[in-house]
Amino acid sequence: MLCCMRRTKQVEKNEDGDQKIEQDGIKPEDKAHKAATKIQASFRGHITRKKLKGEKKADAPASESEAADKKDEGPAGGAAENKESEASAATEASAADSAQLDEGSKDSSVPAEEKKGNGAADTGSEQPAPQAATPAASSEEKPAAAAETESATKASTDNSPSLKADEAQDKEEPKQADVPAADTTATTTPAAEDATAKATAQPQMETVESSQTEEKTDAVEETKPTESAQQEEVKEEESKADQENA
């Protein structure tokens, strides 16, 4: 009886489960599939988020470098603009200075011309006095120049004997110096000739000896082939005699 009761209860439980599935309309397999799809979707989302973070990190240095370049370009551009403004201001100032100088030169040219006219009039009135004074000065300078030339000629004539004596001594000294030099050359020539003769004789002897040794070696080399040829002929004759005897 108990076994029957247990079996009947299990059947009732299974029937209740089937009824619940029918009421829900979802099977356990479908639930597992949905759960797996959810897990896969979450995993994919996690991967995509990591990729996006990496791209953002890669973009951040690029943006920082761009910002730094912009900062560098900013001061450089400002400096260039400042230089251009300074150059324009300098050109304007130079133009103004040149205009002022032109005006000043024009203003100064008129008084200079007036001064020149006044100076010419003054010089015209003052010229006769110097012209009158020049003949007296020239007449005083001529005797002084004549006296200087006479004193110079006297001094040269007084010093001429001493100069001649010095020149004679200078000429004698080179002659005396040349004579010992000639003697030394005469004494040194025999020794030099002996040395040169020995130096020339040694190479000649060496060349003769070398030529003799070469001739000897050539003669030995020539005799060697002849001896070998004779030995070969003797061997051939002996072989022929042996063949005939056989």
Curated annotation (Swiss-Prot):
Q: Which residues form the IQ domain?
A: 32-61
List all Basic and acidic residues biased stretches: 9-33, 164-176, 213-225, 237-246
Domain of life, per UniProt, equals Eukaryota
The terms under GO molecular function for this entry are: calmodulin binding; lysophosphatidic acid binding; phosphatidylinositol phosphate binding; phosphatidylserine binding
Regions of compositional bias (Low complexity) in chain numbering: 87-99, 125-157, 177-203
Consult the record and explain the modifications the protein receives after translation.
Answer: Palmitoylated. Palmitoylation is essential for plasma membrane association.
The keyword Ligase appears for this protein? no
Q: Which GO terms describe its cellular component?
A: cytoplasm; cytosol; filopodium membrane; growth cone membrane; neuron projection terminus; plasma membrane; postsynaptic density; synaptic membrane
**Where does the record place it?**
Cell membrane; Cell projection, Growth cone membrane; Synapse; Cell projection, Filopodium membrane
Q: Where does it primarily localize?
A: membrane
> S-palmitoyl cysteine lipidation: where?
3-4
One biological process term in Gene Ontology:
axon choice point recognition
Quaternary organization: Binds calmodulin with a greater affinity in the absence of Ca(2+) than in its presence.
Q: Which family does it belong to?
A: Belongs to the neuromodulin family.
Q: What is this protein called?
A: Neuromodulin
